[in-house]
């Protein structure tokens, strides 16, 4: 490590302020926190920041549904988010909001600099517009029938059923997801960031060698496909920042969201006197800037964000660390199965250190998805943390307390063994630095196996019963406790709460430098249980609680959904398509009603005598509940004239009168416009 401590600014992607934190979010925040804690443990200066992403149409609409202002809702959600992160020991130096004065000033400044430097243009575009709510509709707020597979109730940008992507204007029977109204096309002036001007800079940044290979390869695909101008504006009504100098135009949420990193850091600088904002963000900054993000937002962080920074005179990120998604038991997180687990639900049932350890044990520096297998989760935490590591302390601490008043030996009996454990520090440090946490955990647990093997071979419980072996017993237990001390130092970034309890037991802080020298002639405190094993029933209870929460939320959401206006077509869908030749076989004619009478002993039928143009027909029709017979005499209607005569109980019916409606009293006879004559063909 260099003599001068590094200065690092580290961020996590900003959680959206319209919902709860779940175990998918926690992967990123735990990954970043482990890396940050490792850097601090090595003496580096780290500013670890985050904020809520608090703007956009979804937040505006959800606040309306909840009957509160967007400001009140995002404040409530922020409190929940911060409570969850604190519960998992995520050690942010500052947690802020994109809806802040700092962010407004920085977003406006960056936009105006980009505009001044010729990177902003405007043009008129056509978008779907909700005529009832009087608002333009984002793609995800339009629903309809997929133009490819014809699946109904699909979003305006892609079909969940067949995976097809499309424009919302291609949907069949599109409806606003906000009001249920049929959207119309409307023109509006929008503002665009000229991303193609930054292609050469972005290619050079990609070739720097610091980006993950998967990210660099993906960027190359985007370059080959051609970079496009980026729409950075949205029309009122919209919850966000107004664009300087424009009326009813707002910054798109993805413009001011990453600027939220800067806004949160600026807020931290204003709180403290020892931080200089410009030192970290100026174009020639010597500090390091790292973003931890999920693979779903690589596009914004690897293209738009560095280009915006470069075009407005700020530094670019040192690196962007991308991770995959979380699956549970090999499948996508599911609310119905209870595997879509909120952070708060987890905290109600299980120790956060368990998840921190399990995620660390499976994380690497690639963009791989991570599977939270709940059975493996239980077994691994119990086997590694309880049986191998914590048990190492409990096997030795009792003897030290009872037989030696808590005092460790004045000399260390196994210097070579200690040197082997301490010598692993550089190797484990390299793995932590490279975010190869899974490999680091494997190194640590391999050392734990050796430590337990040493204790098994020395068998202090046997030595304790032997006369005159007190010094040997104290030496063995001193070695065991020191090996435990090294292991817990290596695990300190992963399990900070367990490390803190270990420090209380050892009566000494765990430091990376301290690993070099064993702890001797030192008093430890009486041993208390440091960690509890996972009971599978706790996991089951968490899953059941998640199911119940999801069901309650779905019921509430369904009740709050705008009811789409029911149409006649939705109540009675179209029949299967027929060929034109089939339709051409039907002979529809205008008929004049010469007489009409009720059929005795029938609740539904009227008997008609019809003139179809020089020929008289007898027809029975089931519209008795809708009309009085005398009211129909002399009217014109439409009849199927070539329908094969049908013998009925009350006589022969020689055609079919056409009427519309669901039935009963809700039936309406089809009548032609004035001028139509009996016998005319209906074309």
Curated annotation (Swiss-Prot):
Its cofactor is Zn(2+). The gene is metG. It comes from Vibrio cholerae serotype O1 (strain ATCC 39541 / Classical Ogawa 395 / O395). Belongs to the class-I aminoacyl-tRNA synthetase family. MetG type 1 subfamily. It is an enzyme of class 6 (ligase). ATP binds at residue 335. Zn(2+) binds at residues 146, 149, 159, 162. InterPro entries: aa-tRNA-synth_I_CS, Anticodon_Met, Met-tRNA-synth_bsu_C, Met-tRNA_ligase_1, Met-tRNA_synth, Methionyl/Leucyl_tRNA_Synth, MetRS_core, MetRS_Zn. Its EC number is 6.1.1.10. Residues 582-683 form the tRNA-binding domain. A motif ('HIGH' region) lies at residues 15-25. This is Methionine--tRNA ligase. It comes from the Bacteria. NCBIfam families: metG, metG_C_term, PRK00133.1. One of its GO terms (biological process) is methionyl-tRNA aminoacylation. A motif ('KMSKS' region) lies at residues 332-336. Binds 1 zinc ion per subunit. Homodimer. One of its GO terms (molecular function) is ATP binding. It is found in: Cytoplasm. Keywords: Aminoacyl-tRNA synthetase, ATP-binding, Cytoplasm, Ligase, Metal-binding, Nucleotide-binding, Protein biosynthesis, RNA-binding, tRNA-binding, Zinc. Is required not only for elongation of protein synthesis but also for the initiation of all mRNA translation through initiator tRNA(fMet) aminoacylation. GO terms for cellular component: cytosol.
């Amino acid at each position: 490590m260099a003599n001068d401590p590094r200065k690092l600014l580290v961020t996590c992607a900003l959680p959206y302020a319209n919902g709860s934190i779940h175990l998918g979010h926690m992967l990123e925040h735990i990954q970043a926190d482990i890396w940050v804690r490792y850097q601090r443990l090595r003496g580096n200066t780290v500013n670890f920041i985050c904020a809520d992403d608090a703007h956009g149409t979804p937040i505006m609409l959800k606040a309306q549904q909840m009957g509160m202002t967007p400001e009140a809702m995002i404040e409530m959600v922020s409190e929940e988010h911060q409570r969850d992160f604190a519960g998992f020991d995520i050690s942010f130096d500052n947690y802020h909001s994109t809806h802040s004065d700092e962010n407004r000033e920085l977003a406006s400044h960056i936009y105006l600099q980009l505009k001044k430097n010729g990177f902003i243009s405007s043009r008129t575009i056509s978008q779907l517009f909700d005529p009832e709510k009087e608002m333009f509709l984002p793609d995800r707020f339009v629903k309809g029938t997929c133009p490819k597979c014809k699946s109904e109730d699909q979003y305006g940008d892609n079909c969940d059923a067949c995976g097809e992507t499309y424009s919302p204007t291609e949907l069949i029977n599109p409806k606003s997801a906000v009001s249920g109204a049929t959207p119309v096309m409307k023109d509006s002036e929008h503002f665009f960031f000229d991303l193609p001007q930054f292609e050469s800079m972005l290619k050079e940044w990609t070739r720097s060698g610091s980006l993950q290979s998967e990210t660099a390869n993906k960027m190359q695909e985007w370059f080959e496909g051609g970079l496009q101008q980026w729409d950075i504006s949205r029309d009122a009504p919209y919850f966000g920042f107004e664009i300087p100098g424009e009326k009813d135009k707002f910054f798109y949420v993805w413009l001011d969201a990453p600027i939220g990193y800067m806004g949160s850091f600026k807020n931290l600088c204003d709180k403290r006197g020892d931080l200089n904002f410009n030192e970290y963000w100026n174009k020639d900054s010597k500090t390091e800037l790292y973003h931890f993000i999920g693979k779903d937002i690589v596009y914004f962080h690897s293209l738009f964000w560095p280009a915006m920074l470069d075009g407005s005179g700020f530094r670019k990120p040192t690196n962007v660390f991308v991770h995959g998604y979380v699956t549970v038991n090999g499948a996508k997180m599911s609310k119905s199965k209870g595997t879509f687990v909120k952070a708060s639900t987890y905290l109600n049932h299980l120790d956060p250190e368990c998840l921190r350890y399990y995620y660390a044990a499976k994380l690497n520096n690639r963009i791989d998805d991570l599977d939270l297998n709940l059975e493996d989760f239980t077994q691994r935490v119990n086997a590694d943390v309880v049986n191998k590591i914590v048990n190492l302390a409990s096997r030795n601490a009792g003897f030290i307390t009872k037989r030696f008043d808590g005092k460790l030996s004045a000399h260390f009996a196994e210097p070579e063994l200690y040197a082997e454990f301490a010598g692993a520090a550089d190797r484990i440090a390299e793995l932590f630095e490279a975010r190869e946490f899974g490999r680091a955990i494997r190194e640590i647990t391999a050392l734990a196996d050796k430590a337990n093997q040493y204790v098994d071979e020395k068998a202090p419980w046997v030595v304790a019963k032997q006369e005159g072996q007190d010094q040997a017993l104290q030496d063995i237990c001193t070695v065991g406790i020191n090996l435990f001390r090294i292991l817990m130092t290596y695990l300190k970034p992963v399990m900070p709460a367990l490390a803190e309890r270990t420090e209380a037991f050892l009566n000494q802080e765990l430091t990376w430098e301290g690993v070099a020298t064993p702890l001797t002639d030192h008093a430890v405190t009486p041993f208390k249980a440091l960690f509890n094993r996972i009971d599978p029933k706790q996991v089951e209870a968490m899953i059941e609680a998640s199911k119940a929460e999801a069901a309650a939320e779905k019921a509430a959401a369904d009740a709050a959904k705008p009811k789409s206006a029911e149409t006649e077509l939705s109540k009675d869908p179209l029949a299967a398509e027929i060929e034109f030749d089939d339709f051409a076989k039907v002979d529809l004619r205008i008929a004049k009603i010469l007489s009409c009478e009720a059929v005795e002993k029938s609740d539904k039928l009227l008997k008609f005598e019809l003139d179809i143009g020089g020929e008289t027909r007898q027809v029975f029709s089931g519209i008795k509940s809708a009309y009085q017979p005398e009211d129909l005499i002399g009217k014109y209607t439409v009849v199927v004239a070539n329908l094969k005569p049908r013998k009925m109980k009350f006589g022969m019916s020689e055609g079919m009168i056409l009427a519309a409606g669901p039935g009963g009293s809700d039936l309406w006879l089809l009548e032609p416009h004035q001028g139509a004559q009996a016998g005319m063909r209906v074309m």
